[in-house]
């Protein structure tokens, strides 16, 4: 016969078992969701390069250069999040459009920046404020006339970027 004490233990085991099964299924669902979102972003990136930047898409060195930014900043965001001490706000995402803009078009710089920020927003737990702030700063970088050869204009652009961070945060 089953006593009340034994029944409570069995009920507790059942609840724990169901909780573990649910957590495994939900974590698997989340992983599948991230894989789908990442695949969609990468597909959009490849389609954009093929249609709007065919010179970059067809030359392996340029394609590797552009793709390396995605991989590097995604990995950097992952490392910062895993550390638990640092925040993803400390990662200088605005460097990407500055460098890409120096070598390629403004449109390509903005698109790569958007893809990097979206990847980072998948990795980090900071929410939409992080994504909004980084996209806003990327727009300021694209719109500001950053000329790395003219130091005064360069520092004015850096001041605009800093003010955007300060006001939006």
What are these regions (language model features)?
Residues 1-55, 61-73:
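Conserved catalytic-loop aspartate of Hanks-type protein kinases
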Residues 50-64, 68-169:
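Generic detector of multi-pass transmembrane helix bundles and their immediately adjacent loops
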